Amino acid sequence: MKCLEHIYSQLPVNGFTTDIFMTDDGCTDGTREAVTTAFPQVRIVNGDGNLFWNRGMHKAWQEAASTGYDYYLWINDDTFLYDGAIEQALLSSRECSDTAIIVGATQSEATGKSTYGLRDAKTGKLLVPNGMLQEGHGLNGNFVLVSKIVFEQLGNLDSHFHHSGGDTDYGLRAEERNIRLLLHKEYIGTCEQHQALSKWCNPDYPLRERWQSLNKPTGMPLKELFYLERRHYGYPKACFHFVTTILHCCFPKLWIDIKH
């Protein structure tokens, strides 16, 4: 609800008509009813409870694409936009003739530090907005603006992925087609960072629970990981990371010791 409130507070955007699509993947906490009451114009796409983030986004985008919009904007429901963020992102896209993907950086409301966006291709660190468009790598799907021109080249998110991985895959597909990933000039809003250490690689949990978590759609499903790595890096690297991910799950404390 808060996410939608922030979106609608800056609509309409000058020169554009906007439609919002939201996937209801079997929600039982009353969100659908609340949205329908407060924002009846939102187009709700129904799921079966097994879509998770990526497949939910894929289904909503598929529905939206049937209308044929000039731009498509992904926004996570835990991302709260600053005033003018959408209009400024559209201007950034037009600045590069709508041939790049515009990614918005988010920051923690508590600390002001960067939480999601694009990374420096050399260092792997999150890029910090500096008032100019910056080319980066490894997009996060919190705020992503895709023009019709780019969509016609890349299409939708890959529904092979349940939850995570789809945004990473989309960014890599773009780079392989020489479509630039550009960080918007300023922070577009706030989003708090998720738990740093996932359950599947957290030594505080027993192996059985870690293994179950690893193979859940919200974990690091091995088949999806292999699919992603094989597509973009080839079989040798895919096989290597398949094995090391299993070892990471089985011996997480060793990984932590090596990292430090």
Residue ranges and their predicted role:
Residues 1-11:
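Short, well-formed alpha-helical segments that are part of the catalytic scaffolds
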Residues 69-80:
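Short beta-strand-to-loop acidic/aromatic patch adjacent to the donor-nucleotide binding site
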Residues 99, 196-260:
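Non-catalytic, C-terminal membrane-associated alpha-helical segments of glycosyltransferases
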Residues 80-116:
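Conserved donor NDP-sugar-binding/catalytic core segment of glycosyltransferases
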Residues 47-67:
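Glycine-rich, basic loop-to-helix element that forms the pyrophosphate-binding segment
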Residues 125-146, 213:
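A recurrent flexible, glycine/aromatic-enriched loop bordering the glycosyltransferase active site
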Residues 6, 24-33:
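A conserved acidic beta->alpha catalytic loop
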Residues 144-146, 150-155, 160-187:
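A short, conserved alpha-helix in the catalytic core of glycosyltransferases
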